[in-house]
């Protein structure tokens, strides 16, 4: 969330002159006394969270904080003082906490980095204004008061006795540690949360251009014919639609088969939907480096062609009148645009677009229970797109450490109905079996959304170390966080059979019941904990389609990443409150999950290519690496932990090395991982405890590779080949026949 230091201004800098007949000293004293009543903050908590206009009467958070909601359409006045550039701000940041009693200058930045939204990769592009800006004259002593939403950065002098604390010093030192690894931490990121998000694409491209590895390419303006566009639409449907099912397959087939050629180039909502799918399909082709070959043009002209179709979809949404009825296709277009930025690892833009989509869905009453007179198909479509958009908003909020637009109190929409947790009968066709699996996937994803939304509402996960240190509600927050982690682990253990990985299959017990064969992190002991979770033994199943295996892996990664993001602040708090057992428990669990995520991804990338087109897995890698960096910074790792850390970093380097050749974001993360691995080796005495895995030999025969990769590496546990090919196997083992094409 967004926090400011609510301090009385000691020496207010003013550009005006004192009144006639009044001394400067008297003027300064009067200013100090009237400062608390003259501060105005232009955003209440409700408006920041919902991104909507304040109502005529004060909203509930404002009544609780003794403040008043004010709606105004006036433009914010210009700042009296000269704005400070972010570059000068980062260069002049104090390296150590000043002495008590002195004052430091603290920047107050706006909630939105810019009053307009642009999609240009270099900062250009036509603006997309954020409509209905809100303002709130809030009481200056409220804990959640927000600074002005204007684009200016003002100065405010704050006593260091109210600012400096052991927790604050630890946070700043951790940021200096990250800067030493090559990670640029801005002042805004340092104030909002301790763990910076994934480096933006612009930063990665700058470093890449400097290194001369990936040449910059202009935006392509060519227009594909219908056959070429249809290929990328199908590529999107095969790669991303199973993970983000925006519509049934029958409706998708009817959309492009009947009206596709007519909608080509039309500024309609159906044409915008096809353009959004085309942009994501080209983006998937670019992720594998095959975009130029498919487009039959030069690599320079093809590398950025997807942005053209993104803009066409965006322009249709921007030209729509907000007074018109919001249809299902409109929310689907918002989902596609948000996915486009997520695939490009532009979390800031995805966060803003998800917020706009949630607000548009509120205007169309998608968050409410469908009307009784609505048909079953329309009601299902509305529920599905609402929960999918809600998850995208919650996911972006979780990654950036910002409030979500979806709130528990304003979300009465029921989750998607879950079919019976069993397999579809053998006589059902392939489409019916796939839709049944997608229904299970939607239900599990909506369950994850509800758990995370409740956690973000109840647990101050992203509050600063200064507020956590010495807080009276710290014990309640940690108890609520522990309950959230247990809910996430229980939900992961209760996944339906279709979405279970092979290593997580249920085995019968002596009393006839079933249980998971793997332990969870909450049930594992603290001392000498090894990476034995499910992620470290990830396995693929022979005969299953790629879309189903992606669903299994991405779901497990989402659950592990949510637990990791919720628990990783305790790694830094462990340095301050080392005697607290609950903080130590969460810190050790975060370390174990970070190693598990990297081990799981390394296992998948070394055996298959089913995740090659999904660049959205990069935030999972980044969160694990930055958690390991915090653990290294705290310096509480023994020899066994250092061995696990080096093994995890070697896994990360093995994953990022091929990705860095085609993805600028991966290159930046790869460079930071190299610096962190060097720090670990230096701390371990200069020796690499865990050697990098050797590359496969070219002399390996085809039969040996087939046997090792397809059978020996894919099955774990007690399952063998004879049992898999037996006619009397269980439904779980016979899953490949149900989904054979």
UniProtKB/Swiss-Prot annotation:
Residues 506-528 have a biased composition (Polar residues). Keywords: Coiled coil, DNA-binding, Metal-binding, Nucleus, Virulence, Zinc. Gene3D superfamilies: Zn(2)-C6 fungal-type DNA-binding domain. SUPFAM superfamilies: Zn2/Cys6 DNA-binding domain (SSF57701). One of its GO terms (molecular function) is zinc ion binding. It is found in: Nucleus. CDD domains: fungal_TF_MHR (cd12148), GAL4 (cd00067). GO terms for biological process: DNA-templated transcription. Residues 44-69 bind DNA. The keyword Zinc applies. Its main location: nucleus. Disruption phenotype: With the exception of OpS5, disables the expression of other genes associated with oosporein biosynthesis. Transcription factor involved in regulation of gene cluster that mediates the biosynthesis of oosporein, a metabolite required for fungal virulence that acts by evading host immunity to facilitate fungal multiplication in insects. Binds oosporein cluster genes at a conserved 5'-CGGA-3' motif with the exception of OpS5. The presence of this motif in the OpS3 promoter would suggest the formation of a positive feedback loop for self-activation. PANTHER family: HALOTOLERANCE PROTEIN 9-RELATED (PTHR46910:SF3), TRANSCRIPTION FACTOR PDR1 (PTHR46910). This is Oosporein cluster regulator OpS3. The gene is OpS3.
